[in-house]
Amino acid sequence: MATETAGAVVESSSAATVPSPAPEAGSKHKLERKWTFWFDNQSKPKQGAAWGTSLREVYTFDTVEEFWCLYDQVFKPSKLPGNADFHLFKTGIEPKWEDPECAKGGKWTVTSNRKANLDNMWLETMMALIGEQFDDAEDICGVVASVRQRQDKLSLWTKTAANEAAQMGIGRKWKEIIDVTDKIIYNFHDDSRTRSSKSRYSV
């Protein structure tokens, strides 16, 4: 069952718990690039553990059919415990500030108080990413769904924070995709490292 599979991933944070998508008859629909799901469970941190030690690479896919199988079985934020994250990033990019592709980047963030709404925005964003719907798709690293006790959030990570034109275009397109009317903000990863809450751009 999908719920059992999701539970197994949440409990063990191991790629070994995710079954390979079953082969389907006929030709598969290849994506423009490979994408990788990651899972980070911070709900039970080990004492003295460094940030990022609970981050696990879970599954890499490159077809539409694999994506839907994985999403249906496992990757819905509403199934996560508090203080856990799902990530979908381009293969080869780790969802860390330290990754060379992310180091000079930043993120657009939207918050949600409803799990169903978070699930919907997460799905719409993932479909837009794997479907290459952004004009500046090469500047996008991936998306993170974060479940927290007070308020959940979705963050779209990009590569070149200093490129205001690219980030504004991505932000406007993302708002359209997830059907959000409230203002969303963009933060540089450099500011987050220094614990600065300053937002650089907004749409």
UniProtKB/Swiss-Prot annotation:
Provide the alphabetized UniProt keywords: Cytoplasm, Disulfide bond, Host-virus interaction, Initiation factor, Nucleus, Plant defense, Protein biosynthesis, RNA-binding, Translation regulation
Q: In which tissues is it expressed?
A: Expressed ubiquitously with highest levels in young leaves and roots, and lowest levels in flowers.
The upper taxonomy is: Eukaryota, Viridiplantae, Streptophyta, Embryophyta, Tracheophyta
Naming one, the record's GO cellular component terms include: nucleus
- One of the record's GO molecular function terms: translation initiation factor activity
Q: Which GO terms describe its biological process?
A: defense response to virus; regulation of translation
Disulfide-bonded cysteine pairs: these are C102-C141
Q: Does the keyword Lipoprotein apply?
A: no
Organism, scientific name? Arachis hypogaea
Give the free-text PTM comment from the record. According to the redox status, the Cys-102-Cys-141 disulfide bridge may have a role in regulating protein function by affecting its ability to bind capped mRNA.
Q: Which SUPFAM superfamilies match?
A: eIF4e-like (SSF55418)
List, alphabetically, the InterPro entries matched: TIF_eIF4e-like, TIF_eIF_4E, TIF_eIF_4E_CS
Null allele outcome, as annotated, is: (Microbial infection) No significant resistance against peanut stripe virus (PStV). Plants lacking both eIF4E and eIF(iso)4E exhibit an increased resistance against PStV.
Q: Does the keyword Cytoplasm apply?
A: yes
Q: Where is this region: Disordered?
A: 1-27
Its function, per the record, reads: Component of the protein complex eIF4F, which is involved in the recognition of the mRNA cap, ATP-dependent unwinding of 5'-terminal secondary structure and recruitment of mRNA to the ribosome. Recognizes and binds the 7-methylguanosine-containing mRNA cap during an early step in the initiation of protein synthesis and facilitates ribosome binding by inducing the unwinding of the mRNAs secondary structures. Key component of recessive resistance to potyviruses such as peanut stripe virus (PStV). (Microbial infection) Susceptibility host factor required for viral infection by recruiting viral RNAs to the host ribosomal complex via an interaction with viral genome-linked protein (VPg).
Cellular localization per UniProt:
Cytoplasm; Nucleus
Annotated protein name in UniProt:
Eukaryotic translation initiation factor isoform 4E
Biased region (Low complexity) positions are 1-25
Q: Where is mRNA bound in this sequence?
A: 47-52, 79, 97-98, 148-153
Which family does the entry's similarity section mention? Belongs to the eukaryotic initiation factor 4E family.
Quaternary structure (record): EIF4F is a multi-subunit complex, the composition of which varies with external and internal environmental conditions. It is composed of at least EIF4A, EIF4E and EIF4G. EIF4E is also known to interact with other partners. In higher plants two isoforms of EIF4F have been identified, named isoform EIF4F and isoform EIF(iso)4F. Isoform EIF4F has subunits p220 and p26, whereas isoform EIF(iso)4F has subunits p82 and p28. (Microbial infection) Interacts with the potyvirus peanut stripe virus (PStV) helper component proteinase (HC-Pro) in the cytoplasm and with PStV viral genome-linked protein (VPg) in the nucleus; these interactions are possible in susceptible hosts but impaired in resistant plants.
